[in-house]
């Protein structure tokens, strides 16, 4: 197998290498869902999957409650989606409602519900769903017009371009269809409000849950980004506030920060997604643009050629003129069929390729978010270990100080300190090494700071005890943050892997459908051209045959048509035609020779025999003939 070919990591498989996992109990198993792929064309799910809470038994009961599982339909839109209603964008209208400048609104229809939304509403819906579900793959929407379009066409013309509007209608409809088919996104009430008539979308954006989203998704729970603390009125509400603070104390790592113990499954997923994006964006889309460009140039040339043939048909008369006109019509029909081919090609091939290029970018963003959650977990874990080592050193120092103080009080009877056990010595060396790694790069500054604090500190015992209390508080906060990071990492890994599996099934079905549609487009193009050229062939056969070639009899033509099918008849080569002409000429020559052999030879006349009945032999031709001397050829003067 080629070394560049790697197995698909999106498929569910056991991890090839262990990864750091929080010490949490396994999640409560759920009943198998009857959900299907968004691209399979099967009926929608009969029930919605719940948004799971990954922490069933968290530390000290401190947890972030997740959204409650749905037990029924939240609105009529949800009921229609579950019943299998399809969403369509039926029209695009130009309007000036709510302002002086005109803009385009898209008419959305779902069952009996009809609503109008502009492009900015679709964009805000995509952004809102991305914030509400940071570890789910949100379908892409078409991008805005480029600055080149505005510069070339102008702002108003670019917005009202019929081609751009038609393309946006198709892509926005695909976006909505993928949303309602998603097992979790299809049950989101924000989407239902978007599809509901007489609902102000601006009010939806400024009301919960969208208004509760954190500015930084890394500081919010992955399974409930809209979680907000409440003023604790009872001891049972205090853990929720503690968890909220723990999430906001998490660090904000860079997406390129390396991991000490990466998860091999997601490393494979990142590598596969990078190849996937490079293949679609850098190879398939580029080749597809080049092919469609050449088809467009060919269609333009065929339109010019058809005009030339039609103009030539006006010069000729009779059967030849009719045949030339039919050939011109066939060329025009091929031009029209090619134009229709390009339109269908854009719908069935170009747009799906672009959608999956956008999907690759979105998946990389989701994998990057999960990577940052993993980095958060490792950073908090390392900081917690450092603080625990620091606390142990401070406590040992405190115990040693108390022992010395007790020894001094007893009159110095015990001055020698006991030797450390070998195991304790090893632990001390390991802690020293971890402290050295943690403070690497700040050695000189730490030494100076320690010396100054030792000279200035007038009460080292009180300072040491204050440091112990402060370190214990830091450890308590880090333990809460560690628990929150562990929950987020576990939920992000499980949910993202499940959505990657769903996306892989959807991708296979979509690529299969794209290949079938492309073959059907070419088949229709061939059918249209075949009919047009058949009509031209019939007109050409009505023309009289070439005078230097014997015409075929009707019996021969019928015999050839009966023995040869339509494909064989149209694929007949010039060699076959010339062979038939040579055979006919041979038959004609044999017939003439037979007729000549049957006729008697004529008797010579007296003038030819010279009166004696003997035919004189022909005289040899003189080399210096008079005509040749005068420069005349055998056909006359040169």
UniProtKB/Swiss-Prot annotation:
Compositional bias of kind Basic and acidic residues: 423-432, 585-601
Composition-biased stretches (Pro residues): 15-30
GO cellular component, one term: cytosol
Function: May be required for cytoplasm to vacuole transport (Cvt) and pexophagy.
PANTHER family: SORTING NEXIN-41
Family per record: Belongs to the sorting nexin family.
A single GO BP: retrograde transport, endosome to Golgi
Binding site for a 1,2-diacyl-sn-glycero-3-phospho-(1D-myo-inositol-3-phosphate): 118, 120, 144, 168
Disordered: annotated segments: 1-69, 215-239, 408-432, 545-638
Protein name listed in UniProt: Sorting nexin-41
Gene: SNX41
SUPFAM superfamilies in the record: PX domain
Membrane topology note: Peripheral membrane protein
Gene3D superfamilies: Arfaptin homology (AH) domain/BAR domain, Phox-like domain
Assigned keywords, A-Z: Autophagy, Endosome, Lipid-binding, Membrane, Protein transport, Transport
């Amino acid at each position: 197998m080629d070394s560049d070919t790697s197995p698909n990591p999106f498929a569910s498989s056991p991890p090839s290498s262990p990864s750091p996992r929080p010490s949490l109990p396994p999640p409560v198993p759920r009943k198998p869902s009857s959900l299907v792929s968004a691209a399979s064309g099967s009926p929608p799910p009969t029930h919605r999957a719940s948004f799971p809470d990954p922490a069933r038994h968290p530390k000290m009961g401190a947890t972030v409650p997740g959204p409650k599982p749905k037990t029924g339909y939240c609105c009529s839109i949800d009921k229609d989606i579950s019943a299998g209603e399809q969403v369509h964008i039926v029209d695009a209208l130009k309007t000036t409602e709510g302002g002086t400048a005109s803009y385009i609104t898209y008419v959305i229809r779902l069952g009996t519900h009809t609503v109008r939304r502009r492009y900015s509403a679709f964009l805000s819906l995509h952004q809102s769903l991305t914030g509400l579900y940071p570890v789910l793959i949100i379908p892409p929407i078409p991008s805005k017009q480029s600055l080149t379009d505005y510069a070339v066409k102008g702002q108003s013309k670019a917005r009202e371009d019929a081609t751009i509007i038609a393309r946006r209608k198709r892509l926005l409809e695909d976006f909505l269809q993928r949303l309602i088919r998603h097992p979790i996104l299809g049950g989101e009430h924000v989407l239902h409000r978007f599809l509901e008539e007489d609902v102000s979308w601006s009010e939806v954006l400024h009301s919960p849950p969208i208004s509760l989203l954190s500015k930084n998704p890394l500081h919010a729970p992955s399974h409930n980004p809209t979680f907000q603390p409440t003023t604790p009125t009872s001891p049972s509400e205090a853990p929720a506030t503690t968890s909220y603070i723990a999430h906001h104390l998490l660090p904000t790592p860079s997406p390129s920060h390396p991991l000490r113990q990466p998860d091999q499954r997601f490393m494979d997923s990142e590598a596969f997604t990078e190849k996937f994006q490079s293949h679609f964006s850098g190879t398939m889309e580029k080749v597809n643009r080049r092919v469609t460009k050449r088809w467009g140039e060919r269609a333009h040339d065929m339109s010019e050629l058809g005009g030339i043939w039609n103009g030539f048909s006006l010069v000729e008369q009779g059967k030849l003129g009719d045949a030339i006109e039919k050939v011109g019509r066939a060329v025009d029909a091929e031009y029209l069929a090619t134009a229709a081919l390009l339109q269908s090609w854009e719908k069935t091939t170009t747009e799906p390729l672009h959608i999956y290029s956008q999907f690759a970018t979105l998946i990389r963003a989701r994998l990057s978010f999960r990577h940052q959650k993993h980095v958060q977990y490792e950073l908090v874990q390392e900081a917690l270990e450092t603080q625990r080592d620091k606390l142990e050193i401070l406590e040992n120092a405190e115990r040693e100080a108390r022992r010395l103080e007790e020894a001094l009080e007893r009159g110095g009877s015990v001055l020698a300190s006991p030797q450390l056990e070998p195991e304790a010595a090893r632990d001390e060396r390991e802690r020293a090494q971890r402290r050295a790694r943690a403070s690497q790069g700040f050695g000189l500054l730490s030494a100076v700071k320690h010396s100054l604090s030792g000279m200035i500190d007038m009460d080292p015992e009180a300072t040491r005890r204050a440091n112990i209390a402060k370190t214990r508080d830091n450890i308590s906060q880090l333990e809460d943050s560690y628990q929150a990071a562990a929950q987020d990492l576990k939920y992000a890994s499980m949910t993202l892997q499940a959505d990657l599996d769903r996306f892989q099934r959807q991708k296979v079905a979509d690529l299969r459908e794209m290949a079938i549609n492309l073959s059907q487009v070419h088949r229709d193009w061939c059918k249209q051209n075949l009919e047009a050229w058949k009509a031209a062939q019939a007109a050409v056969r009505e023309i009289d045959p070439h005078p230097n070639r014997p015409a075929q009899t009707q019996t021969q033509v019928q015999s050839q048509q009966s023995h040869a099918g339509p494909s064989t008849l149209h694929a007949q080569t010039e060699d076959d035609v010339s062979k038939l002409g040579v055979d006919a000429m041979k038959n004609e020559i044999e017939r003439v020779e037979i007729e000549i052999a049957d006729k008697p030879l004529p008797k010579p006349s007296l003038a030819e025999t010279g009166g004696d009945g003997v035919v004189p032999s022909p005289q040899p031709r003189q080399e210096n003939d008079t005509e040749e001397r005068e420069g005349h050829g055998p056909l006359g003067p040169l």
